[in-house]
Amino acid sequence: MTDSIYDQLNAYGTVAKQRFVENFSGWQLDTDRWDQSNTNGTQVMADSIDGGLLMSTTSSGSSISYIDFADKKQFSNTGSVMIAVMKHGSTTGGESYTGLQSGTTQGNGQGAWSYVNDSWKGAVFNFYTVGASGGTWVQTGCVTSDTNWHTHKIELTSSAGSLQIDGNTTVTSTTNLPAVSLQPSVGINNTSAVNRTLNIRYMECYNT
């Protein structure tokens, strides 16, 4: 007999913890789940195969496109995982944050993010953690922040945070870890006359 999905995901005798899976499919974003925030930005479902959600800015230097759980912080700072599959249309002229955070605007509050900003932090993905006393940046070193699809996995424990790209590169931070509960978030902004885009087609978050 095939086990239920519950039995496959959890050891026998245990009680499941919070988990959600988002495939970013259909004709519009599920606004019963996601809160949208835009400053000259948009979020629409991509009209392309496996395109997921297309987040876009304009050429305005203050353009922002951002989604989160409307400040419903359901995930633990000492035991949680976020997995996201996404690609950037451009890695210059702005920045992107994808991760778990306590704030309600892009990169705000405490949290842990997979971060891209080619002009400031180099042409690689960065792991950025923020705690009560400040932030810590760790470069992945060998994973270029290009315009291909990548799988990003962030994990938080009581003693460390880690970022894994495509299952084979992991960087770890043990300083400035978040000390409060967190919500999933995705955001891009623009700092020059470049129309930035980000496609995201899968996200999963769960408490461990």
Model-predicted segments: where are they?
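Extracellular carbohydrate-recognition regions
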Residues: 2-37
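Short, aromatic/His-centered strand-loop micro-motif at the edge of beta-sheets
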Residues: 129-151
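Extracellular glycan-recognition surfaces and repeat-rich motifs
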Residues: 27-55
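Beta-strand-rich interaction surfaces with strong enrichment in secreted/lumenal proteins
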Residues: 66-74, 138-144, 173-174
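Short tryptophan-centered beta-strand motifs in secreted/extracellular beta-sheet-rich domains
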Residues: 24, 82-84, 147-163
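Short strand-turn-strand beta-turns centered on an Asx-Gly dipeptide
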Residues: 164-169
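Flexible glycan-contacting loops in extracellular carbohydrate-active proteins
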Residues: 173-203
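Secretory/extracellular carbohydrate-interaction modules
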Residues: 55-124
